[in-house]
Amino acid sequence: MNIMTGCLAPTSGTVIVDGMDLQQEPEKVKQRIGYLPELPPLYPEMTVREYQDFAAKLKKVPRLEQLQQVVQAMNKTGLIEEQDHLIRTLSKGYRQRVGLAATLLGNPDVVILDEPTVGLDPRQILEIRDLIRSLREEHVVILSSHIHSGQVAFDLV
């Protein structure tokens, strides 16, 4: 996961995304990748909306597109009703959604998810799995999971 996202350089081989080599064109490739680590780096003192705006700026989402992309990401992840809540008040499942919404900003071609359901209760796992399944319509989804039941959401395992 760390090599595919550009966090770690490969000792051999290459990572190619849309015909571009990650080592030769890291910024261009990273713009096409959305990454959700197992423990998303969230700021508990921010509201959901503030965090999404912050993430959009970090991802260099053009200012004119920022509002639309933030609202769209919150809609996709079921966070519109939660946008004014502090992240620290959210359940683990909703905090995971906050990280996933931020991952979708910039409209990445590839979405890489590292253990997105770890620590969630059974209901939250089903909700996140359905959400991930819906992402397949617009993104290539790469998922790391130790839970084999997660395989039902994917075409290739």
Tell me the role of every PLM-derived stretch.
Residues 5:
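Helix-to-loop junction immediately C-terminal to a conserved catalytic motif
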Residues 13-21, 28-33:
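Conserved ABC transporter NBD signature motif
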Residues 53, 57, 64-82:
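Conserved ABC ATPase "signature" region
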Residues 86-90:
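Conserved ABC ATPase signature
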Residues 100:
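Hydrophobic anchor residue at the start of the ABC signature
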Residues 111-115, 120:
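Catalytic Walker B motif of ABC-type/P-loop ATPase nucleotide-binding domains
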Residues 125-137:
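Helical segment within the ABC ATPase nucleotide-binding domain
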